[in-house]
Each structure stands twice: as structure tokens, then as C-alpha cells.
Amino acid sequence: MRQLMLGNKALARGLYEGGCSIVSSYPGTPSTEVTEEAVKFEEIYCEWAPNEKVALETAFGASLAGKRSFCGMKHVGLNVAADPLFTCSYTGVNGGLIICVADDPAMHSSQNEQDSRHYAIAAKVPMLEPADSAEACEFAKAAYEISEEFDTPVIIRMCTRIAHSQSIVDTKERVCPPTKLYEKNIRKYVMTPANAIARHPFVEERTARLAEFSNTSSLNRVEKGSEPIGIITSSTSYQYVKEIFGDRVSILKLGMVNPLPEKLLLDFAKEKELLLVVEELDPVIETYCKSLGISVHGKDVLPMTGEFSQNLLAEKLSKAFPKLAELIGTIPSGRKLDEEIPGRPPVMCAGCPHPGLFYTLSKNKCTVLGDIGCYTLGAA
């Protein structure tokens, strides 16, 4: 059945279709709706954890018991969950384990603009990055297969625009693999120094196998264009590039952003008169390409901060490259509304019991230090 779905809802659908049994998450925009949608499936047990570290530990425990599990959080939540993330990279999994982290370029509801791809690189775990709702659903199922085949947790990186945009999803039936029985394996699952030393070579060997997988996986694809110009991109940026250039340039669309596909990148770079990397936030793909000796343009013409858009890319690329200016032409600026839509900054949720406390603290001119976004709103 074809349905119009938010990216987060589609990801929850992918968890259901992929046989997920347990979801443990900590809420935070733009990740929250994944768990809110997953709880609607009777076959999935869902809970909110007291923090992201506990959420990942709960999901990891379910994985050890042989169940396919999931935990979700926003980008800053991965800071809190970093301890178990790095350790379960060494231990590996039993049942498939997905960690969803939702980045927030332009900081619509966040205190920083950190790029979660660095965590996947540092922890040496695979990361998938969908570019629309259909991929969010399919990548969830693919992540479970990768997790169990390579004995690793898998991170799915969402972002605000993918999480909160809608596109068509072809829904399918749930496929639930047999539960893998738990085996007590101290050397694999208890990371004392001696055991961790023995597991580290496994992590390095696994990374090499994942890199080979990335080279041939259908998660990454090449779309050939009519001009000798190539663009390497992923996630939301792919949609902007496609809308601007259509089929006129060749595009390497990356769905697996760690490990990056070395051979595929080198092959794509051949016979290109101009090669660009279009990615929001940090130059992760660009830096890797340059480490391979590939000459690319990226952050020398595109901003390091904020979100991209069709107009922003068209303006920056046209100014930097006359050849692209010819291909781009004029991008319509869009219609102007008779009345501007008022801004909708974050507010306390309806029914929240805490505004009274914040009012009292403010009235008494108290200075209070907090951590999560709700406390930040109290400052207003």
C-alpha cells in the first residue's frame, strides 16, 4: 500500500516491517515522532528512558537477548549515549541494533549544530543516511540486516528536513526473523581490558569488510548525467541538487556515509571536468575524497553552517562556476504570501506542569542552570 508519511513515521514503519521488538528512546526534536509512531504497533514494546545513555543500554540489552531493537535521540543526545555506543561497537550484537540520531542543521530547536557523522567514524560503526521517507523505511530494514551480518550496531542519521517532510512510502508486511538465543559469552560481551584488547582487531577487520560492502551496496548509487560534471551528495542535499540540475549532471548519491565507498568514489571521479561535494555542516565526505587524492570543491564555495536550500545552492554555485550558471539558469524565487506566516518558536507542551515553577523562579530573579531544551525554554 502506498502512503504519504513523515520521515519519522516512515522510519517507525521500517522498524515494524523489519521485525523490531523493543524501542527505548529519549525524546528530542527532531527525533521524537519515531517512537511516538512505533508505539502504535502492538508487536513493538516501547518506552521512554530517563536519558539517552539508558535508552541505548536498554536497546543493547534487548539485542543481547536476541531481539531486534532500536533507540532514538536527537544529535546532542548521542553525547550522553557515547559511553555505551563506543563499548557496544567492540562487543557487537546478537539481535540487530539500530541507533537513530536526528541532526538539526540551522538549530531549529537545538543548542548546537554538531554533525553526528563524526561519532560513526570515531566509534567505527556503519551509518546510513536516508534522503526521503521511502528510504527511511527501507534503510531501517537494511540496517537490521547489516547489524546482524556484520555483528555491529548501526546508526541511522536523520535530519530535521527528512524527519519532518512527507513523501510516498510503499508499505509491506512485517517480517520477523527467529529470535536468536542468548549465549553467555564473557569474552565477547564483558569489556575488561584483556577482552577489549582481543576485540579491537575484530572492529578493525569489520570496518574493512563494511568498506567493501559500501562499494557495492545499492544504498549508494550513481545517476549519470549529460554533462561531464559530477556531484557527490547525500540526505537533504541530494533533493536540492536533483531539483536544480535534474539529469544534466552526474550524481553519486550516498546512502551509506560510513564507511565511505573508496572505489566507488574514485571511479565516479574519473573523466569529470568539475567535481563537487554538496553536504550540510562539516566537510566529512569532502575531506575523505581529498584524502584519496580526488580534486573536489565543497566548503570553499558552500557554507559550513546552517541549512542549504535550492536558492542558496543555485546562487553559490552559479557565482563560483560559470559552467554551472549556464545549467542552472534562473531559479524561481517562489510566491509571496499576502500575509506572512507568524513564526512558531518552541514552547512548553500543552499541559506541562512546569511553567508555574519557571514563572516563580523568574519572578524572584533566580539564576538556574539546566540541561535539556525544556529548561532552556524556562529562561524565556
Question: Predicted segments — roles?
Answer:
Residues 1-8, 12, 17, 130-348, ...:
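Flexible, low-complexity linker and terminal segments
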Residues 22, 29-148, 358-359, 367-380:
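Thiamine diphosphate
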Residues 25-28, 199:
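Selective for proline/serine-rich intrinsically disordered segments
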Residues 26, 219-225, 371-373:
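Short coil/turn segments at secondary-structure boundaries
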Residues 27, 73, 253-255:
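Residue-level recognition of beta-strand->loop/alpha-helix junctions
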